[in-house]
UniProtKB/Swiss-Prot annotation:
This is Phenylalanine--tRNA ligase beta subunit. GO terms for biological process: phenylalanyl-tRNA aminoacylation. SMART domains: B3_4 (SM00873), B5 (SM00874). SUPFAM superfamilies: Class II aaRS and biotin synthetases, PheT/TilS domain, Putative DNA-binding domain. Pfam families: B3_4 (PF03483), B5 (PF03484), PhetRS_B1 (PF18262), tRNA_synthFbeta (PF17759). Gene3D superfamilies: 3.30.56.10, Bira Bifunctional Protein, Domain 2 (3.30.930.10), Phenylalanyl-trna Synthetase, Chain B, domain 3 (3.50.40.10). GO terms for molecular function: ATP binding; magnesium ion binding; phenylalanine-tRNA ligase activity; RNA binding. Mg(2+) binds at D361, D367, E370, D371. Its cofactor is Mg(2+). PROSITE patterns: B5 (PS51483). Its EC number is 6.1.1.20. The gene is phesB. Belongs to the phenylalanyl-tRNA synthetase beta subunit family. Type 2 subfamily. The keyword Transferase does not apply.
């Protein structure tokens, strides 16, 4: 959860609390009731001491409250938002009514070039006119940008914010994408002019906090850049603004531009910045729009767009879900306390809520129910014993896994736990298999080692053998864990715990894998382990192979194994696994120096464990 650092004295002043009489415990209770948490009480001096190890007496010793807020409550990421919400909650302020005014003149336009589509296609903008900053509000303005960048903006990769002194610029503005060498300007907090290529090199070689953002656009042949009508660079998103339009305490008119890969997130960020600080404008809670024009010369709209959406919530649903019994009019009153204007439907069976632009977290009636519960007070909710009796128990598949893990350990095998993610080769080519598209791939893999979800336990067992070359032979290891297989979408048969249809496009299988490594391949060791497993599960040997009851073995042509040594395991007429001596090419792929034999079984309740679980129950 994001933490917001706020000066206690400034916060208390904004809330109308008298510092000498309002205690920390009272504030903690207020936070809990509202749904946030006072996580830590510290000071700037103490925070710097913890960071550097040296106490600096020149740093302020004012009390700082660190407040935990929900990750989706972007309106609570600054002093202004928290104070505004708590004042309405405490009946000390009315719900603010945000207003927009059209562009002051034809210069408040932003033109988009076609080239930006390949690098950062979305831009929106707005203006705070006649704003008055104090040192505290200025610091909060900067801090909110950093909080948004770290949260919804995903460290600027998804969205980035640029703020500028409008009086130093001349509209209209132009959003372009140019070659790095063609972008020249003096970046923020610098005195020398750089082109973008030189600037990236400068930041890459320095200890600047901006270094971590360079990879976002570094490999692009063109970089996004915003100019004014006099060809002055406003910003190089998502990296740095220009020094020319730097925001100062004396700034009166603020131009805010937000570039992004996602228009919805861009609008949320722009609206948050504007609504939080519009209270300092000459006309409080008023924002000026900017017209954005696309590459074809067509207007994409005026921003910000602050139309309130409406959500209907059934009165019975709210009462039942929250465990309360209050009237519809009481719900309207409680929602007003949570800064939500609402009214009753004509039949008074539902509540129509006007969701303000600051509450992007409200998307469903359940969110309305949650705010009613907060307004009602969690401490006021009555504890009730459920009118149904349930008995908890272990999931059958987990019970089966635990039973087999104990038995295999008693047979002298060591249990291992390995990574669920792997490379593509571990699912296919390293095991002498062709890629059949059955693996679930990670869309934004952090490492080349972890790009897919494993489809088998064989590869991780072989990796474990390879990693334990220094251990004395024989090596006897096993693992019981899940693998994931890509499956077609469809309606899952809930009565069948092993149904391969999943509403997420993939399904898990519980697998058992065991490996034996020694100077010679002794398949009888693994075969003996299989026989022990079948004995424990009360599955008889079907010597005739005709009854579909019991288990038997048949020759396998799986290229994982040395020809003539691969064996399929058939239980109740279904193939549930295989075992054999691992092929030398596969051993080479995993740098295994000695022969290995492997057993891999799919564990299912209906096929593998029906007898033993029925007996135990």
């Amino acid at each position: 959860m994001p933490k917001v650092n706020i000066n206690r004295d400034i916060l208390y002043k904004a809330l109308g609390f008298y510092i000498k009489t309002y205690t920390q415990e009272q504030f903690e209770d207020l936070c809990f009731a509202f749904g946030v948490e006072l996580d830590e009480v510290t000071s700037e001096r103490e925070m710097k001491k913890n960071e550097t190890g040296v106490e600096d007496l020149t740093v302020s010793d004012d009390v700082i409250y660190k407040i935990d807020v929900s990750a989706n409550r972007y309106d609570l990421l600054c002093l202004e938002g928290i104070a505004r919400a708590l004042n309405v909650y405490n009946h000390k302020a009315s719900i603010p009514k945000y207003q927009i005014v059209p562009p002051k003149n034809s210069h408040e336009k932003l033109y988009i070039s076609k080239e930006v589509e390949s690098v950062r296609p979305v831009i929106v903008a707005g203006i705070l006119r006649d704003i008055t900053f104090t040192q505290e509000s200025y610091d909060s303005f900067i801090d909110l940008q950093e909080k948004l960048h770290a949260n919804i903006c995903k460290k600027r990769s998804l969205v980035s914010i640029g703020t500028h002194d409008l009086d130093t610029l001349s509209g209209p503005f132009y959003y372009k994408a140019l070659a790095p060498k063609d972008i020249k300007f003096v970046p923020l907090s610098q005195t020398k002019e750089y082109n973008a290529e030189e600037l990236f090199k400068f930041y890459d070689e320095s200890s600047s906090h901006l270094k971590k953002f360079l990879p976002i656009i570094k490999d692009s042949p063109v970089y996004p850049v915003i100019y004014d009508s006099k060809n002055v660079v406003c910003s190089l998103p998502p990296i740095i603004n220009g020094e020319h339009s730097k925001i100062k305490l004396s700034t009166k008119n603020v131009f805010i531009e937000v570039t992004a890969n996602d228009r919805t997130k861009a609008n949320i960020v722009l609206n948050t910045m504007l609504t939080m600080f519009s209270e300092y404008c000459k006309q409080p809670f008023t924002m000026e729009q900017v017209e954005v024009i696309d590459a074809d010369g067509k207007s994409t709209g005026l921003y910000p767009q602050i139309q309130e959406k409406q959500i209907n919530a059934q009165v019975d649903y709210i009462n039942k879900s929250a465990g309360i019994n209050i009237t519809p009019n009481d719900m309207v009153t409680l929602l007003k306390r949570m800064s939500l204007q609402s009214k009753l439907s004509d039949d008074e069976k539902s509540i129509i809520v006007d969701v303000p632009v600051t509450r992007s977290d409200i998307m469903h009636a359940c969110d309305i129910m949650e705010d009613v519960a907060i307004g009602y007070g969690y401490d006021n909710l009555k504890k009730e014993i459920p009118n149904c009796n349930t008995i908890g128990r272990v999931q059958p598949i987990n019970k089966l896994s635990e039973l087999l893990a104990n038995e295999i350990a008693l047979a002298g095998f060591t249990e291992i736990m390995t990574f669920v993610l792997c490379q593509n080769r571990d699912n296919f080519t390293a095991l002498n298999k062709a890629d059949d598209g059955s693996s679930v791939k990670i869309s934004n893999a952090v490492s080349e080692e972890f790009t897919e979800v494993r489809t088998n336990l064989v590869s991780t067992l072989l990796k474990s053998v390879s990693a334990n070359k220094a251990a004395p032979l024989p090596l006897k290891m096993f693992e019981i864990s899940d693998v994931s297989i890509k499956g077609s979408l469809g309606n899952k048969d809930l009565s069948d715990p092993n149904s391969n249809n999943s509403d997420v496009g993939a399904y898990n299988k519980r697998m058992l894998g065991a490996i034996y490594c020694n100077q010679s391949a002794k398949i009888e060791v693994i075969h003996g382990l299989l026989d022990r497993i079948m004995l424990v599960l009360d599955i008889k040997l079907d010597a005739t192979r005709s009854s579909n009851k019991g288990y038997y073995l048949e020759l396998s042509n799986d290229k994982l194994f040395l020809p003539g040594t691969g064996i399929n395991v058939i239980v109740n007429g279904k193939r549930v696994g295989h075992m054999g001596i691992v092929h030398p090419l596969v051993l080479k792929n995993y740098s295994c120096s000695f022969p290995c034999t492997i057993l891999e079984l799919e564990l299912t309740i209906d096929t593998m464990a029906h007898n033993v679980l029925l007996r135990e129950n």
